[in-house]
């Protein structure tokens, strides 16, 4: 097909005019059309939340394909695998539709080829592209194509630790061991070992992994801050700050003397006020920095006289108290600023004095880091296992050093497209530059939604292009999508009101002006005053709680407020639970949130990443069991195992056993005492009674058998032996939240199996890996279990990005920002390099013996202070963007929920606004989201803000005021039905009383069971069923049926029945994670989770399962997982025509897709068959019952029914 020319500027303008004048209900905006059709230059699309950026990308791709571009000529990078899958699905539908609509034969054929090539298109994450690239071109760097990815954090940690200790030993024993020893001591802290240094090394390594060339950055930028340090300039800046602070203080005191001070004539503090004014008055234009510093020192000294009371207005007159309080508050603020400046003078002096020593330390650190980076790189090459960042580095290395490879890709790609460009890091940006020909990049993103700085994403990459393209269109085209098609006008107005007053270039990194403001465009949502954004505050005054306490009472007060609103939405407005989302900035309070919701019976599902897997009780018990098997001399682990439900020793029994003597008096341990207790049991019956002796013998025998088994079997087999020997897996399943506990135990076995497949063998190394993960204060992700279908969503703001919910609650608005990075011993900057705290040893000059002769002083280097300021601004900017993402998730209504003392909050005063923004100090002194919202509410009281705050006290949050969750009946989700089992039991008891009466009156009906499964009904009715003249399977002679003369199998190997295979296949289909890409490897891992024997697993053909998902029905299921229901139980009342009795039909539907006006029902069958019609006939009646149950439940008549036949070598999907 010939390439059709792209649209000119004039043609695009005509298209925009035609669209504006069209009668379409939902029109494309002029900017969307511009973004879809503009070509032949670099394009940056700044797409605000809800502006349809995915639609624009898909339309642009479709337009290019329709003009003759091949799908293989497009490089399309998405931020997540899920986003790539969704884009492919959207393109598949659009291309298919275009094929149907066009009459052009050439275009049909061309688009048909693109549709066929779509699965192989370069649409995916950067990581997926680099993996394929290195697999193809890695030979250029001597990298084997069968490399693997170090996705397991624990395996990565083991490798890092091993390499660290190798490099550490080399430096510690090397020529520069004295300077290295100084470096080691600088980070040793209280531990006085290498852990402090190791922590900083790993932190710097993670930072380096986001640079395009780690070694180059280390050599060129790591010491840049030391090289350009200018203390003269810093002193001048500090002097200017001192001048300004002294002038501010002078202005404040003079205003006070001229006004309020007249009310306090002859008050003692006024003399000291005048004294300070005289000191400041001694300064003039000729005064140098020394003079200013001297005045500052005298002023600060006066402010500290009499513990600060020298300048305090101590008036106790009731009518003058507000004036006195206001003066004292401002005075404290002014002198706190002066005190900080006084400290900075001293710090700057120390920084200059120890600059040379700190630089020397930094050079030693640079040398160590360089060796570590190279050693770790080589070690990973030996293992042929890499992190994703390594793959990217090698890809860049090949593209930079092999021009023929780079040019082939630049010629191949007609356009290089990237989604979520605001979250790009420097290594990704370099790769995009190398793949592009310089003028064919299409970048879509929104800097206001850049929230991944902790992953080294740099929003300034986006911002730099935004500014450059805006100022010089020749550099590239800037297109701004402002219209929001997602949210109500109430949500958008509240969001604009907040960020117009909060975000600017100084704090926020962008000016929130008309280029960034959200514009309402969802014409389907009409304005509704009830949807005005609500800023809800739990009033702590009612409970008298302390400001900083984090008690459960306080949190449940806030949660009760939320629960009240949820119940109101659900019960008064009919809002489904799944339409409500609870967003948090972190998961630290999730346990208490979940507890509060469960107390009121509100179903909830989390984002599945609690990261507290190793803290779960059942996993801790198993880890202690493994520790004891490895080394029984560990007392803590041994006691934990003995007290666990597996053996159940109580305190009395353990005390009796611990009173035994040990062989080793110096290092006595419990295990030796147990051995001795076993030997001496017969002679110490008073201490070791018979029952205890038998219990101890059983424990020691089982432990010995496990230890022996561990020597000859895999970890996976050992763990399952423990589960089976002591029925531990079954035991935890009977506990509250049993399925989740069992899933955790499953995961432990699987993780042990993965560990041993990663070139690490043995129980010892597995335990050491777990201990290292715990020591590093990391954890493994918790295992997700099937969530309820209709449930409130609880997730972090990061996880909510890209999602939307009708009603959004932003919780914990009062939770303080995480500032751990700014308290670290090391702060890095891409521009300045290393900032470090130097530990200086100083002579005290003390003569007396009881005074220390030397002290250690922690001195932040000049670069550290500069990096700290840069980090503070970047952190506050990111927090603003995080709040923006959270607020723009809401479609209809937004709730911002916090807590605080009403009295304290309402008494707070703030500086006046400047240029329509909060004062920069107000913004930078905020500790949390709530501080910003409250300050806006107070400073802009005259503005008609589109959100309102409201305090809610304890009197409004009693159990009666909140209410209860009303129970409802029609076809409930099984998770909610479980909450009402007590009602079912009561009904059952009432029915049992009448059993005898029913038996007497309805004897004829007794032959028909009252509760049946569809298969039972089929068997019961087979003699009389008439399925439109079709013969019932199993009746009469089967035509053409082959007769088998095979000898019976008398072998001793395990027999596998068809029922076992069928049951295992059904469980496998239920467990498959459809959100991930399906591969043979992923199915193999899922199969391991199926509760069956290995013999049955061996009989399941995974290729056939994989083939099913390539069928039309399989693809429809993958594309519509939001509509998918699997393994759904149902019950239905039917009447037997012979006895005229009602009976209940119960069963489990394999799965169905629920659409608005249609249901697609499917059922898996593993029966053997000759012709599909045999199984269609056999199961037609069963599917008819399923159809009837669904039709009754959802009032939908249009139901398609499919049998998925897995009984032959090839899968068949048959419509019934």
From Swiss-Prot:
GO MF term set: 3'-5' DNA helicase activity; 3'-5' exonuclease activity; ATP binding; ATP hydrolysis activity; double-stranded DNA binding
EC number: 3.1.-.-, 5.6.2.4
GO biological process, one term: double-strand break repair via homologous recombination
Domain UvrD-like helicase C-terminal: 515-802
Cell inner membrane in keyword set: no
Catalysed conversion reaction: Couples ATP hydrolysis with the unwinding of duplex DNA by translocating in the 3'-5' direction; ATP + H2O = ADP + phosphate + H(+)
PROSITE patterns: UVRD_HELICASE_ATP_BIND, UVRD_HELICASE_CTER
Observed phenotype of the null mutant: Cells lacking this gene grow poorly, are more sensitive to UV light than wild-type cells and have reduced double-strand exonuclease activity.
Cofactor(s) named in the record: Mg(2+)
GO cellular component terms given for this protein: cytosol; DNA helicase complex
Residue span(s) of domain UvrD-like helicase ATP-binding: 26-488
SUPFAM superfamilies named in the record: P-loop containing nucleoside triphosphate hydrolases, Restriction endonuclease-like
Function according to Swiss-Prot or TrEMBL: Involved in DNA double-strand break repair. Is not involved in recombination during natural competence or in plasmid establishment. The heterodimer acts as both an ATP-dependent DNA helicase and an ATP-dependent, dual-direction single-stranded exonuclease. Recognizes the chi site generating a DNA molecule suitable for the initiation of homologous recombination. The RexA (AddA) nuclease domain is required for chi fragment generation; this subunit has the helicase and 3' -> 5' nuclease activities.
UniProt xrefs under PANTHER family: ATP-DEPENDENT HELICASE_NUCLEASE SUBUNIT A (PTHR11070:SF48), UVRD / RECB / PCRA DNA HELICASE FAMILY MEMBER (PTHR11070)
Assembly and binders: Heterodimer of RexA (AddA) and RexB.
NCBIfam families reported in the protein's UniProt record: addA_Gpos
Name of the featured protein: Exonuclease/helicase subunit RexA
Top-level taxonomy: Bacteria, Bacillati, Bacillota, Bacilli, Lactobacillales
The encoding gene: rexA
């Amino acid at each position: 097909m010939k390439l059709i020319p792209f649209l000119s500027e004039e043609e695009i303008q005509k298209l925009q005019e035609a669209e504006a004048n069209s009668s379409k209900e939902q029109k494309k905006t002029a900017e969307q059309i511009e973004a879809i059709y503009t070509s032949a230059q670099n394009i940056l699309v700044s797409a605000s939340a809800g502006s349809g950026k995915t639609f624009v990308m898909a339309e642009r791709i479709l337009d290019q394909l329709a003009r003759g571009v091949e799908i293989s000529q497009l490089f399309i990078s998405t931020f997540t695998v899920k986003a790539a899958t969704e884009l492919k699905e959207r393109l598949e539908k659009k291309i298919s539709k275009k094929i149907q609509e066009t009459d052009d034969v050439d275009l049909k054929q061309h688009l048909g080829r693109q549709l066929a090539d779509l699965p192989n298109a370069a649409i995916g994450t950067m990581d997926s592209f680099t993996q394929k690239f290195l697999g193809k071109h890695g030979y250029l760097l001597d990298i084997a194509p069968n490399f693997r990815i170090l996705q397991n954090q624990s395996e990565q940690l083991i490798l890092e630790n091993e390499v660290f200790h190798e490099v550490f030993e080399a430096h510690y024993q090397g020529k520069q061991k004295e300077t290295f020893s100084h470096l080691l001591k600088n980070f040793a802290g209280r531990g006085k070992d290498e852990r402090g240094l190791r922590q900083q090394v790993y932190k710097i390594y993670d930072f380096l992994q986001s640079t395009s060339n780690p070694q180059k950055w280390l050599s060129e930028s790591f010491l840049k801050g030391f090289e350009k340090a200018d203390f003269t300039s810093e002193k001048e800046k500090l002097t200017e700050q001192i001048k300004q602070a002294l002038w501010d203080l002078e202005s404040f005191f003079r205003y006070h003397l001229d006004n309020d001070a007249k009310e306090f004539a002859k008050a003692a503090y006024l003399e000291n006020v005048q004294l300070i004014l005289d000191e400041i008055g001694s300064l003039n234009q000729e005064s140098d920095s020394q003079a200013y510093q001297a005045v500052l020192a005298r002023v600060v000294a006066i402010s500290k006289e009499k513990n600060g009371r020298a300048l305090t207005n101590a008036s106790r007159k009731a009518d003058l108290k507000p004036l006195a309080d206001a003066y004292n508050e401002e005075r404290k603020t002014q002198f706190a600023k002066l005190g900080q400046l006084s400290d900075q003078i001293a710090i700057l002096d120390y920084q200059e004095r120890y600059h040379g020593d700190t630089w020397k330390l930094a050079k030693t650190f640079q040398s160590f880091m360089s060796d570590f980076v190279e050693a770790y790189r080589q070690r990973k090459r030996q293992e042929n296992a890499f992190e994703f960042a390594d793959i990217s580095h090698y890809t860049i290395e090949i593209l930079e050093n092999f021009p023929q490879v780079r040019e082939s890709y630049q010629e191949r790609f007609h356009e290089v497209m990237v989604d979520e460009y605001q979250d790009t890091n420097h290594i990704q940006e370099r790769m995009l530059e190398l793949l592009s020909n310089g003028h064919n990049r299409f970048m879509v993103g929104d800097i206001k939604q850049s929230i991944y700085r902790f992953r080294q994403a740099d929003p300034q990459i986006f911002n730099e292009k935004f500014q450059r393209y805006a100022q010089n269109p020749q550099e590239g085209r800037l297109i701004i999508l402002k219209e929001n098609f997602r949210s109500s006008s109430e949500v958008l107005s509240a969001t604009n009101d907040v960020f117009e007053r909060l975000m600017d270039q100084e704090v926020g990194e962008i000016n929130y002006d008309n280029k960034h403001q959200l514009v309402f465009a969802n014409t389907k949502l009409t304005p509704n005053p009830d949807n005005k954004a609500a800023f809800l505050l739990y009033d702590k005054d009612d409970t008298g709680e302390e400001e900083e306490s984090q008690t459960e009472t306080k949190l449940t007060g806030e949660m009760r407020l939320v629960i009240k609103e949820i119940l109101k939405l659900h019960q008064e407005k009919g809002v489904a639970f799944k339409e409500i989302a609870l967003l948090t900035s972190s998961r630290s309070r999730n346990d208490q949130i979940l507890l509060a919701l469960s107390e009121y019976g509100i179903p909830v599902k989390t984002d599945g990443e609690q990261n507290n897997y190793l803290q779960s009780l059942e996993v801790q018990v198993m880890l202690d069991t493994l520790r004891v098997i490895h080394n029984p001399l560990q007392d803590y682990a041994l006691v934990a195992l003995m007290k666990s439900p597996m053996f159940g020793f109580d305190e009395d029994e353990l005390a009796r056993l611990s009173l035994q003597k040990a062989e080793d008096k110096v290092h006595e341990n419990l295990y030796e005492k147990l051995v001795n207790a076993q030997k001496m049991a017969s002679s110490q019956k008073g201490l070791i009674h018979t029952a205890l002796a038998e219990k101890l013998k059983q424990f020691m025998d089982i432990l010995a058998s496990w230890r022996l088994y561990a020597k000859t079997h895999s970890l996976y087999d050992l763990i399952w032996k423990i589960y089976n020997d002591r029925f531990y897996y079954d035991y935890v399943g009977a506990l509250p939240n049993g399925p989740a506990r069992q899933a955790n135990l499953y995961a432990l076995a699987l993780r042990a199996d993965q560990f041993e497949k990663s070139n690490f063998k043995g129980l010892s190394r597995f335990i050491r890996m777990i201990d290292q993960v715990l020591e590093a204060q990391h954890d493994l992700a918790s295992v997700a279990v099937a969530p309820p279908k209709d449930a409130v969503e609880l997730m972090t703001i990061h996880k909510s990005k890209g999602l939307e919910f009708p009603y959004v609650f932003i919780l914990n608005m009062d939770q303080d920002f995480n500032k751990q990075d700014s308290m670290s011993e090391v702060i890095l900057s891409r521009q300045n390099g290393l900032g470090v705290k130097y530990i200086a040893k100083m002579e005290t000059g003390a003569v007396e013996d009881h005074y220390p002769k030397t002290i250690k002083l922690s001195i932040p280097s000049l670069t550290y202070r500069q990096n700290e300021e840069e980090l503070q601004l970047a952190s506050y900017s990111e927090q603003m963007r995080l709040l923006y993402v959270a607020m723009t998730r809401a479609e209809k209504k937004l709730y911002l929920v916090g807590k605080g003392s009403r009295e304290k909050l309402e008494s707070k005063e703030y500086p006046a606004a400047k240029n329509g923004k909060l004062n920069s100090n107000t913004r930078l002194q905020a500790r949390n989201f709530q501080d910003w919202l409250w300050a806006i509410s107070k400073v802009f009281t005259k503005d008609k803000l589109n959100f309102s705050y409201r305090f809610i006290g304890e009197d409004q949050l009693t159990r009666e005021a909140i209410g209860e969750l009303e129970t409802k009946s029609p076809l409930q989700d099984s998770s909610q039905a479980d909450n009402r089992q007590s009602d079912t039991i009561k009904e059952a008891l009432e029915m049992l009383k009448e059993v005898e009466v029913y038996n007497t009156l309805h004897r004829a009906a007794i032959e028909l069971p009252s509760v049946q499964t569809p298969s039972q009904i089929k068997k019961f009715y087979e003699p009389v069923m008439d399925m439109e003249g079709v013969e019932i399977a199993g009746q009469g002679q089967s035509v053409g049926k082959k007769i088998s003369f095979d000898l019976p199998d008398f072998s001793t190997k395990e027999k596998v029945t068809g029922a076992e295979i069928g049951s295992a296949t059904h469980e496998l289909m239920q467990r498959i994670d459809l959100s991930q890409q399906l591969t043979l490897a992923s199915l193999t891992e899922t199969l391991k989770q199926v509760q069956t024997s290995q013999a049955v697993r061996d009989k399941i053909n995974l290729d056939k399962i994989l083939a099913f998902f390539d069928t039309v029905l399989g693809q429809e299921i993958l594309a519509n997982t939001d509509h998918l229901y699997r393994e759904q139980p149902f019950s239905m009342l039917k009447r037997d025509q012979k006895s005229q009795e009602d009976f209940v039909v119960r069963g489990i539907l394999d799965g169905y897709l629920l659409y608005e006006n249609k249901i697609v029902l499917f059922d898996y069958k593993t029966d053997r068959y000759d012709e599909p019609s045999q199984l269609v006939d056999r199961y037609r009646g069963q599917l008819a019952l399923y159809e009837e149950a669904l039709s009754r439940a959802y009032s939908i008549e249009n139901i398609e029914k499919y049998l998925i036949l897995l009984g032959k070598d090839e899968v068949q999907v048959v419509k019934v």
